[in-house]
From Swiss-Prot:
Xref: PANTHER family: D-AMINOACYL-TRNA DEACYLASE 1 (PTHR10472:SF5), D-TYROSYL-TRNA TYR DEACYLASE (PTHR10472)
Protein name per its UniProtKB record: D-aminoacyl-tRNA deacylase
NCBIfam families: D-aminoacyl-tRNA deacylase
Record gene name: dtd
Catalysed reactions, as listed in the record: glycyl-tRNA(Ala) + H2O = tRNA(Ala) + glycine + H(+); a D-aminoacyl-tRNA + H2O = a tRNA + a D-alpha-amino acid + H(+)
Amino acid sequence: MRAVVQRVNEAKVIVDEKVVGAIGKGLLVFVGVGKDDTEKDCEWLAEKVSGLRIFEDEEGKMNLSIMDVGGEVLVVSQFTLYGDCRRGKRPSFTEAAPPEKGKELYEKFVDLLEKKGLKVEKGIFRAHMHVHLVNDGPVTLLLDSSRLF
């Protein structure tokens, strides 16, 4: 699984002109599921996201996690994180999971975050979404359960 994690002051997802998910201070997490991913990848990613120490402590150092600051998480599915742009000008998405598997593991990831006690909002899987956010920092991190980066 791949994720782009952004520290935000606020974020929301709009589908068909309706807000379907919104958070205040916290993390916006774009998640892509690969064709070879399993529940172990979900578990690794949920543990990593919930434990990332990217919020500032009283001394201004990045030393606190989303759990420590009581922040919220907005999770948005994004299969394009598996777009391969190495050849030609059109991305190939052959490494992305098929929709059924992608949805199953996306929902599992959300469930694991909720079980950790986090307030989680989400977009709508496979919908065309408009994502609005106010970055904090900005702080943006790339995660890959295959540890490619």
